[in-house]
Amino acid sequence: MEDSDVERRVTAKVAWRFVPFLVLCYFVAYLDRVNVGFAKLTMDADVGLTDTMFGFGAGVFFLAYFLLEVPSNLALDRVGARRWIARIMFSWGLISGAMAFIPTIAARTGVSGEHTFYILRVLLGFAEAGFFPGVIFFLTLWFPAAYRARIIGYFMAAIPLSSALGSPVSASLLGLDGALGFKGWQWLFVAEAAPALVLALVTYFYLTDRPPDARWLETEERDWLVDRLAVENKARDSVSPASVLRSLYDPRVLAASLIYFGVVAALYGVGFWLPSIVKGFGVSIALTGWITAIPYAVGFVGMILWGLSSDSSMERIGHLSIALAIAAIGIGASAALDDPLLKMVALTFGAFGVFASLPIFWTLPTAILSGATAAAGIAAINSIGNLSGYFGPFVIGWIKDATGSFAWGLAAVAACPAAALIIALALGHDRALEKAPDGAHRV
C-alpha cells in the first residue's frame, strides 16, 4: 500500500480518536476559566467587588498560571500526558466549584470576600497551569508538521465554541437565582465545574501517551507514524538540559512570547468584560447571553477556515499578520463607537482576527523546537504570553472605574495585537523558519 494511503488512514484515525475528546476537555477548561465574566453580572454585591477588583481577580489567574507553566509542562513530558492532564483537570474542577462558596469561605475564615476571590483565582491558575501547552505538545507527538495548523485549529476552536455555546447557558444558570437557597452565580460555578471532574477520570483511561503505545493502530500504521515523526524531529535540536535552557533564551521564543502576549491581551481583555459591555446596552441577562455568543460564533468559523487556508498554502506569517491586523482594527473601532449595533459589529470583526490568529501562531514554536525543548519552549511562550491575561482584564476594569466608560480600556487592549503585528512581520524575516519539515511552516 502506498505511503499516501497509510498517511491518510493514520492521520484520520489519530484525529478522530483525540481531537473531539480534547476539544471537549478544552471547552470545559475555557468555560471554567472565563465563566467569572458572567458571574460578575450578579456576584459583585455578594462578594463586594468594584470593577478594578474584578479585573484584578480575573487577571491574577494568569500570574499564577505563569509561575507553574514551565514546571508543569516538563512534568507532563516526564510522567506522560494521560496522567498529568487528568491531574490538571481534577484540580481545576475542584477549585472552580469552590468559587461558588466564596461568601461561606470568607465568613468561616475571616478573610474578606474580595481576598477570597483573589485566592481562589490564584489557586485556579496554579491548578490549570500546563493544560493548554501540554495538549499542544501532546499533539506534536501525534501529528506530522503538515497537519498541525488545522489540528491545533480544531482543538483551539473549543475557545470560541465554549463561549458561543456557554454564554447562553451561563446566562440561563444565572436565572436559577434562589433555587435551593443558592444564588444564580453560585449555580453557574457548580454546574460548570462538575464536567471537569468527570472528564479527569475519562482522560486517565482514554489518552495514549505516545505513538509506540498505540495498540489501537495497526502495526503498519504505528510504524509509519513513528518513522515519519522521527524523521521530522531529527532535523531539530537534540534533547538535553542545555537545549531546554537554550530554548528559554532563544530570541525567536521571546518574539513568539510577545506576539502571544498581544493576542491574549485581546482575547481575555475583551472576553472577561464582554458580558458587562453587552449588559450595558440595557438588555436583559438572558439576551446578554445570546448577544455575547455572536463574536465567538464568528471567531469559531474564522479559526477553522483560516487554519485550513494556512495549511493549504503552507504559509504562516502572512496569515498571522492579516489576522492580527483585523483584531487590532476591530477592537480599536469598538472603542470609538457608541452605537450598540456598530460596537458589536466591530467587536465581532475583532473576534474573527483574534481567533483566526491562534492556530496559525501555534505552528511556529514547533517549527523551531522539538522534544523536551518543545515542551519547555511552548510552556515558556504560553506562560509569558499569558501574563497579558492579567494585563487586559485589569486595565479595562481600572480604566472603567476611573472614567466610567469601556472606551479607553478597549483602545489600550487594541494596541496589543497591533504591537504583535509588528513583531510578527519582523519574525517573518527569520529564514530559519523556512526550513521546517516538509515546508509545513514556511513563512
Give, region by region, the residue ranges found by the protein language model:
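Glycine-rich segments within core transmembrane alpha-helices of 12-TM secondary carriers
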Residues: I152-L174, P195-A196, N382-G392
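Cytoplasmic helix-loop-helix junction between adjacent transmembrane helices
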Residues: L120-A157
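C-terminal transmembrane helical hairpin of 12-TM major facilitator-type secondary transporters
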Residues: M314-L364
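A late C-terminal transmembrane helix in Major Facilitator Superfamily
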Residues: S370-S405
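Extracytoplasmic gate region of multi-pass secondary transporters
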Residues: V36-G37, R246-I304, L358, W362, ...
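Helix-to-loop junctions at the C-terminal end of transmembrane segments
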Residues: L68-G80, G302-E315
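Conserved MFS/SLC helix-loop-helix module at the cytosolic interface between two early adjacent transmembrane helices
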Residues: L67-A107
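Cytoplasmic membrane-interface "Motif A"-like loop-to-helix N-cap segments
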Residues: R78-M89, D311-L324
